[in-house]
Amino acid sequence: MADPSFDIVSKVDAQEIDNAVNQTVKEIRTRFDFRDTGASATLSGESILLVANTDERVKAVLDVLQEKFVKRGISLKALTFDEPKPSGKEFRLPVTVQQGIAEDKAKAIAKKIRTDGPKGVQAQIQGDQLRVTGKKRDDLQRVIQILKTEDFEVPLQFVNYR
């Protein structure tokens, strides 16, 4: 019989992202403080473009977007963005939705498992996810608890627990 294992992934449901952006657009259209500001939010692939006529309005649109993400159960750790940049008469803020675990974060997670995890538990980096194997399921559950207490700046999900 094979050793028990599970995968650590960082994925965000594309449909939930679409729903959150659509709800943001709907709220922008109905709110009085966004009238005549040219505020909009558009989704294209893994990125969301927020546009408004002032720096403050773009940040307000970002707040609305973050509120909708939280309501839909999407971790805000999956969003990356910079400061709004002027573009002609408007300000633009590109927001990127991270999918997968970056290599440097994966190495940090694997190191945490090696140093703080139970003996005999191994973590292997497989592209944008990690596979954790061990002799006992109790050890794997302990690893999950250890990782939940740490902040790796990416939302982690534990899947394929066998």
Swiss-Prot record:
Signal peptide segment: none
GO cellular component: cytosol
MF-aspect GO terms: nucleotide binding
Pfam families membership: DUF520
SUPFAM superfamilies: YajQ-like
Listed Gene3D superfamilies: 3.30.70.860, YajQ-like, domain 2
Keyword Nucleotide-binding: yes
Lipid metabolism found in the keyword field: no
Keywords, alphabetical: Nucleotide-binding
HAMAP family linked: YajQ
UniProt record similarity statement: Belongs to the YajQ family.
Function comment: Nucleotide-binding protein.
Name the UniProt record assigns to this protein: Nucleotide-binding protein Francci3_0558
